[in-house]
């Protein structure tokens, strides 16, 4: 499942109402029959989140929104990691989404997208659902749902802190976040050469993270998020970074993806220089972990 080989990447028949109800989606996927790509890498763009949350709920009895706070934000002592819209009294706020706020409904385009998703493109079908644009317009109802693969809300510093712990053997600022054994396991088995059946490029999915199929230009692993935000880590060099922005369903997504390569190159250069001259202390911006119901500071 964490290699995107469950054969359940498609979203045929799911309505916008279904997709905004995580329990419904977990139940639908639990009852679904795996498709022909079972056992083959086929990016589960949206269904991956409900597969994971359904499993987590069965094991822990807790939903993924709570697990984000208890297993990520709290041990890392940061408020900037949420699933969905942060509570009104949380220090973290959702930035205004720039795109596609002003895109008008287009019946022809909607019909074409639905047919494309249904009949031809496995990759597009794994990401598309009716009403996708409306879900991120206005007050963005998508943020009030529990969609673990698509509606995480994070600050760049908090996301980089999580990946930084992985880059540093599972520890950051004296906090043990993951065991060294688990971090070692994350770095293994990343030599996939066959292309992903949905995205048509080899992404080396392993334990939920993917690599980047461009030689050694972006060593390490991480994950690109909805709209083109990204978190990345390279335990071999101890480098990690995160880039987040407030664009969704934007034509600039591919530009963002290409930009990661250049940004990462500059970060690696800066890290190498810092190792030679010594590290400089950085002001600890960003709110620490906030207990539910605590007043925003």
Predicted features by range, described:
Residues 82-83:
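Extended amphipathic alpha-helical segments with heptad-repeat/coiled-coil character used for oligomerization
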Residues 51-52, 145:
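Short hydrophobic "helix-edge" motifs at membrane interfaces and signal-peptide entry regions
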Residues 24, 51, 68:
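Short Gly/charged-rich anion-binding patches and loops
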Residues 1-46, 54, 60, 129-133:
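Active-site-proximal loop and beta-strand segments within enzyme catalytic domains
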Residues 40, 45, 57-79, 88-297:
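Catalytic loop of the DD-peptidase/beta-lactamase superfamily, centered on the K-T-G motif
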Residues 8, 49, 247-248:
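Solvent-exposed loop/turn segments at secondary-structure junctions
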């Amino acid at each position: 499942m964490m290699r995107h080989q469950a054969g359940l990447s498609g979203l045929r028949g799911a309505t916008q109402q279904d997709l905004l109800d995580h329990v419904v989606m977990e139940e639908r996927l639990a009852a679904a029959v795996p498709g022909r790509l079972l056992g083959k890498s086929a990016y589960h763009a949206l269904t991956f989140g409900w597969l994971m949350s359904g499993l987590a709920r069965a094991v822990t009895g807790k939903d993924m929104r709570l697990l984000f706070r208890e297993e990520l934000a709290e041990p890392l002592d940061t408020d900037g990691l949420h699933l969905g819209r942060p509570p009104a009294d949380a220090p973290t706020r959702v930035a205004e989404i720039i795109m596609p706020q002003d895109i008008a409904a287009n019946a022809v385009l909607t019909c074409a997208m639905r047919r494309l998703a249904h009949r031809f493109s496995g990759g597009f079908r794994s990401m598309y659902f009716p009403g996708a644009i409306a879900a991120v317009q206005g007050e963005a109802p998508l943020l009030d749902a529990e969609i673990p693969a698509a509606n995480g809300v994070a600050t760049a510093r908090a996301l980089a802190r999580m990946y930084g712990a992985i880059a540093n053997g599972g520890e950051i600022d004296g906090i043990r976040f993951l065991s060294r054994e688990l971090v070692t396991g994350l770095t293994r088995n990343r030599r996939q050469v066959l292309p992903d059946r949905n995205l048509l490029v080899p992404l080396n999915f392993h334990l939920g993270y993917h690599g980047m199929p461009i030689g050694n230009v972006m060593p390490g692993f991480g994950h690109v998020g909805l709209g083109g935000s990204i978190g990345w880590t390279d335990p071999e060099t101890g480098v990690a970074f995160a880039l987040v922005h407030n664009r969704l369903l934007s034509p600039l997504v591919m530009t963002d993806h290409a930009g990661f390569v250049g940004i990462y190159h500059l970060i690696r250069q800066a890290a190498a220089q810092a190792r030679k001259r010594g590290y400089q202390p950085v002001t600890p911006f960003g709110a620490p972990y906030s207990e539910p119901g605590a007043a925003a500071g």
